[in-house]
Amino acid sequence: MIKLVLLRHGESQWNRENRFTGWYDIDLTDQGREEAANAGKLLREGGFVFDVAYTSVLKRAIRTLWSVLDAMDLMWIPVFKSWRLNERHYGALQGLNKSETSQKYGEEQVLVWRRSYDTPPPALEKSDERYPGSEPRYADLAEEEIPLSECLKDTVDRFLPIWHETIAPEIRKGRKVIIAAHGNSLRALVKYLDNISEEDIVGVNIPTGIPLVYELDDDLNALRSYYLGDQEALKKAVDAVASQGKASQ
């Protein structure tokens, strides 16, 4: 039986401030660093080892992976970074407070932007200072690959090529893999692995800093999945993610 570990980065500063983060390169909070270290401890105590790791090009995911590998004494394994594992791009919402945005546009509209499958938020203009095309880390991308806004469908379409062409072949070779990424890029993979419908993916929330273990058969079909750690704390963390888009009372 094959085990694949998925890990959303620890709490970032904009998670704490309840902002749409997207491709903005915000760092972890102290709590986020603690979550990452604890994830590494849980994995070590659970007897997990890894041969190769994958992450995005955003520091909150990279630093989370560093902390995990440090806690497991695995900092020597190969780490591959790709923009394809980045968070979903939130377009013109990036940097805005989620509760304030809900007050302005309504909770239902913000839920659609946050969690629907095929409705992207309002797009950025290329002249906007938040447009990622001017950043050196994306210099090798074609202009059409750099998003102005993304829905989850766009994120799935961005993520699956690296899964099929790079990650899945490594797993089939017998390599033990961890993917440290973001809430929506991981939701994209979870949707694929569990064959979740476009309607049901709306209700899937992935908490920060808690390892999600997938057990796969030889054809990489999902047999079951589960989170490591305290289940009561897990429920609170999932509920907290679900409530982020609600208007402040």
UniProtKB/Swiss-Prot annotation:
GO terms for biological process: gluconeogenesis; glycolytic process. The active site is at H9, E87. Gene3D superfamilies: Phosphoglycerate mutase-like (3.40.50.1240). The record marks H182 as: Transition state stabilizer. Its EC number is 5.4.2.11. Keywords: Gluconeogenesis, Glycolysis, Isomerase. The keyword Isomerase applies. Signal peptide: none annotated. Pathway: Carbohydrate degradation; glycolysis; pyruvate from D-glyceraldehyde 3-phosphate: step 3/5. Substrate binds at residues 8-15, 21-22, 60, 87-90, 98, 114-115, 183-184. It is an enzyme of class 5 (isomerase). It catalyses: (2R)-2-phosphoglycerate = (2R)-3-phosphoglycerate. GO terms for molecular function: phosphoglycerate mutase activity. Belongs to the phosphoglycerate mutase family. BPG-dependent PGAM subfamily. Catalyzes the interconversion of 2-phosphoglycerate and 3-phosphoglycerate. This is 2,3-bisphosphoglycerate-dependent phosphoglycerate mutase. The lineage of its organism: Bacteria, Pseudomonadati, Chlorobiota, Chlorobiia, Chlorobiales.
